[in-house]
């Protein structure tokens, strides 16, 4: 819906003509941006030369980027990684090359393809790209952003224009609201104290302080149930549940449930909306403190 904009659609591939055609098809859906995925590290993608596999074929990556930019009228962005492995860290030069291709923003995950999701994301290199005087497009940092505090540090320490949150959203779709509220609250405090620390990338956004209220446990379970309903309505019950149940089973709000392992297994095996909803309602009861 229009309320959910801006909306981006991400595509990946290694065939030039197919990528251009895919971008044209995607443009018909009227997204606000088309993102080219040159960062997915999984074997079934990168092993075939797509996603992060493009980091081993920079000329083709740049050609695809240039041609997609020329083929569509909406903004094109790119997401990629630092390089293929620790011996091939190329992001500083690559960022300039991609910018020259005409992209409107660049998202950098702070690991190489070989690292997959192991170790820690190297935000120092992301910061170096952002602070490169030759870079004028927005730089979006990605990797290990799990808390509001980490998100704010990324803005203040590395100067990025935005942060992208990935795995931390599993079972926690409210994380964006919590991060946004925390950042604005802290920046507002700094301003009141006379500190000139407000990030320019945040100053133009409307403040949520007047409308934000902390989410209760009931609120969060309601949101998870809504997420389940929306996914089923937009796809179908079978695939909607497949997409949703692993997110629900990963939710951090259930860590307070004793012996949650069996409940988690039940979530991952649930096949109907009714089954999953019943499990969530059981969790709601089990998480509430005993009444004296």
Spans of features found by a protein language model:
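Alpha/beta catalytic cores of nucleotide-metabolism and tRNA/nucleoside-modifying enzymes
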Residues: 71-73, 87-105, 117, 124, ...
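Short, flexible micro-motifs
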Residues: 16, 42, 52-54, 86, ...
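Glycine-rich, positively charged N-terminal anion/phosphate-binding segment
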Residues: 1-32
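Short, solvent-exposed beta-strand edge segments and adjacent coil->beta transition regions
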Residues: 4-8, 49, 264
């Amino acid at each position: 819906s229009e309320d959910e904009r801006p909306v981006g659609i991400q595509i990946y591939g290694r065939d030039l003509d197919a990528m251009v055609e895919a971008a044209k098809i995607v443009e018909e859906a009227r997204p606000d941006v088309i993102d080219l995925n040159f960062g997915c590290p999984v074997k079934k993608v990168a092993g075939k030369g797509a996603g992060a596999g493009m980091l081993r074929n920079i000329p083709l990556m740049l050609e695809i980027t240039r041609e997609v930019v020329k083929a569509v009228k909406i903004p094109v962005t790119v997401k990629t990684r630092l390089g293929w492995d620790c011996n091939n860290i190329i992001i500083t030069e690559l960022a300039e090359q991609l910018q020259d291709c005409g992209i409107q923003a660049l998202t950098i995950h702070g690991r190489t393809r070989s690292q997959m999701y192991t170790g820690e994301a190297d935000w120092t290199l992301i910061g170096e790209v952002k602070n490169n005087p030759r870079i004028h497009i927005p730089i979006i940092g990605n990797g290990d952003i799990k808390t509001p505090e980490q998100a704010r540090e990324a803005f203040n320490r590395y100067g990025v224009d935005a942060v992208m949150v990935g795995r931390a959203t599993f079972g926690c779709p409210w994380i964006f609201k919590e991060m946004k509220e925390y950042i604005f609250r802290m920046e507002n405090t700094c301003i009141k104290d006379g500190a000139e620390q407000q990030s320019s990338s945040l100053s133009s956004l409307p403040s949520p302080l007047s409308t934000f209220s902390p989410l209760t446990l009931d609120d969060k379970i309601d949101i998870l149930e809504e997420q389940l309903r929306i996914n089923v309505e937009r796809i179908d019950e079978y695939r909607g549940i497949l997409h949703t149940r692993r997110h629900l089973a990963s939710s951090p709000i259930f860590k307070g449930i004793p012996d949650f392992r069996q409940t988690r297994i039940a979530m991952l095996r649930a096949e109907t909306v009714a089954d999953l909803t019943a499990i969530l309602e059981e969790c709601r009861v089990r998480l509430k403190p005993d009444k004296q």
